[in-house]
From Swiss-Prot:
Protein name as it appears in the record: Protease HtpX homolog
UniProt source species: Leptothrix cholodnii (strain ATCC 51168 / LMG 8142 / SP-6)
Cofactor dependency: Zn(2+)
EC number(s) stated in the UniProt entry for this protein: 3.4.24.-
Record-stated family: Belongs to the peptidase M48B family.
Length: 291
């Protein structure tokens, strides 16, 4: 269930490239030198914010395959592969979406769904998941991922990320201009040191606030996908068992390079604010309390 983390990492990379390109083309100097047209700045911020988010969305499926080494198994004759494909097909039909690509990758117990459109998505399962869970538990995890696709969560998170990106780009530059021109009284043509330092600092600080907001929305989508899996299965019990089993897996077993993307991490303290997934205990409790 790595799709949000993969999306956010790609989005940050795209935003960084767009930001560097804008600086090289002189956009920052233009806004600081022309009295800062707020309407023009807002338009620029929206292009930067939503551009980065939607480019990340379009790149999400190939990036996920590349980063995990996932192999598509839709046409594989292997019995286990056929069972996985048939399970995804059955749940997709119930959810009213087109059949996604189904992939398998080597790794710790995990799964993810991604793709720019719900009718051309990818559902991937790790070998570790197949080895550590019973079939009904694996089905519950697959149902969870199909529910993400059916709910349009990738597009929803893209829109939220785009709004947050726009917020960060606009406010950091508007405040940077105010500090540079009004507080430090820079009257030279082009941005001064106050603008540049303030913009960089606020990009970081506001980016942290934006990340917490995006993570909060992501956690709500996880609860909804859990409920969707229970509905597709016709029972809450398999999803509860799958979550309980994941909760017993030591997060330290995951490689450091992908530890932040695992479903079974247990962030605590302030780091919980940046987690894309709620605590396992909360997810089980929500399923138990659902009608």
């Amino acid at each position: 269930m790595k799709r949000i983390a993969l999306f956010l990492i790609t989005n940050l990379a795209v935003m960084a490239v767009l930001g560097i390109t804008a600086s090289l083309l002189g956009f920052n100097r233009y806004y600081a030198a022309t009295g800062l047209d707020l309407g023009a700045l807002l338009g620029f911020a929206m292009v930067m914010g939503f551009g980065g988010a939607f480019i990340s969305l379009l790149m999400s499926k190939p990036m996920a395959k590349w980063s995990t080494g996932a192999v598509v198994i839709n046409d594989s004759p292997e019995p286990m592969h056929r069972w996985l494909v048939d399970t995804v097909a059955r749940f997709s039909k119930r959810a009213g979406i087109e059949m996604p690509e189904v992939a398998l990758y080597e790794g710790e117990p995990n799964a993810f769904a991604t793709g720019a459109f719900k009718n051309s998505a990818l559902v991937a399962v790790s070998t570790g998941l197949l080895q550590s869970m019973s079939r009904d538990e694996v089905e519950a995890v697959i149902g969870h991922e199909v529910a993400h696709v059916a709910n349009g969560d990738m597009v929803t998170m893209t829109l939220i990320q785009g709004v947050m990106n726009t917020f960060v780009v606009f406010l950091s530059r508007a405040i940077g201009y105010f500090i540079d021109r009004v507080v430090l009284k820079n009257d030279r043509e082009g941005p001064g040191i106050g603008y540049m330092v303030t913009t960089v600092v606020l990009d970081l600080l506001l980016g942290l606030v934006a990340a917490m907001i995006v993570a909060w929305f992501s956690r709500q989508r996880e609860f909804r996908a859990d409920a969707g899996a229970a509905q597709l299965m016709g029972s809450r019990v398999p999803m509860q068992r799958a979550l309980a089993r994941l909760g017993g897996i030591d997060p330290g077993e995951l490689p450091q390079s992908v530890a932040t993307m695992g479903i079974n991490g247990r962030p605590s303290g302030i780091m919980a604010l940046f987690s894309s997934h709620p605590p396992i205990e909360d997810r089980i409790r929500a399923l138990q309390q659902s009608a």
